[in-house]
């Protein structure tokens, strides 16, 4: 009787609360039949993005929800609660329902072990012929753990080399004032977490209590190959990330710049992700069109990569680095398309960069390889303070070993991309 009363109280509390924070576990793995596709959205939101996660979860409930052919599953870690595995579905009356399928013990979601556990539990409860994975949180591409925290950057105001965006140009006050004071005026609208006094903490993916998932750890956390992976996170659209993940997924959708904290328009994209076959190009177009139509926050970059073409990109790149590596130190780096703000000079356009050190014939061969790998790309004219030249936008970023950062160069040598192309010897 006591257990029945306890269960009743928990159920009542679950109904009252707006967030899906109930502790009830619904069903057992044996009750779930294998379907065509399962999509897991891994929302590591036990951080300053929690309200954005809440809004995105609500948006998912407004869009396409699969019936007999698929499962929409969300790993949801909101502050002050244990992570939950949620299934967005329809109940017996046809109304949208968010069922709590599994309640995880207290954990840090910005670890490889937590991600791997979430994927394995999802596969157990929601077996499918194919799986898609959306990684939602903070991110800073391929950089090693805590590199930002231990490597402060110069203020934008110290060199004045980067142009203002259209909003800043209309300001009657010093547009760099907040940078001079050590603050980023756009910190609240992008998926970037503030760190210590040195600047911003870095991570390949995820951020919680100072923990991050290194890109190499991320690969090891994926227990099987996904048909597609999407990063709703900053700066993941680089050749280093793509090449590291080439054996973990068939396709990637990500952004070479930062991403806005508002996230993807989930109510619009799910129909494309659950289509058969998955239409990542339509998904990317939906994302781009959504932000390109905005009046104030008209900022977005997006790329779709076919990972089976990346080996050829590396082969061609190696030929270029073998003959043009010595030219890197003398290139006009300010003339290369950048994808960073705040002088975080680790993300440049790969095609624009290669064109500076390759022969005309080599550059043409490389461009052909990139165009086969990047099957869709789009960018607004600006991403905040970064002008995006459509003729230079290849859809992929790269590191350029120009600033004599020995620690970063040593780490870069451990990445699969550098092992394949030999940019840094």
Task: Mark where each language-model region is.
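Bacterial N-terminal signal peptides that target proteins for export
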Residues: 1-9
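N-terminal carbohydrate-binding/catalytic regions of secreted carbohydrate-active enzymes
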Residues: 49-84
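Loop/turn elements at helix/coil->beta-strand transitions in domains of secreted/extracellular proteins
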Residues: 36-38, 67-73, 126-132, 223-228, ...
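Bacterial Sec-dependent N-terminal signal peptides
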Residues: 1-2, 16-39
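Surface-exposed loop and adjacent secondary-structure segments within mature catalytic domains
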Residues: 77-101, 130, 134-206
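Solvent-exposed loop/turn segments at secondary-structure junctions
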Residues: 45-48, 78-82, 107, 137-143, ...
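Short, solvent-exposed loop/turn and secondary-structure capping segments
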Residues: 52-53, 84-85, 143-148, 241-242, ...
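Terminal, contiguous helix-loop blocks that mediate binding/assembly
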Residues: 164-425
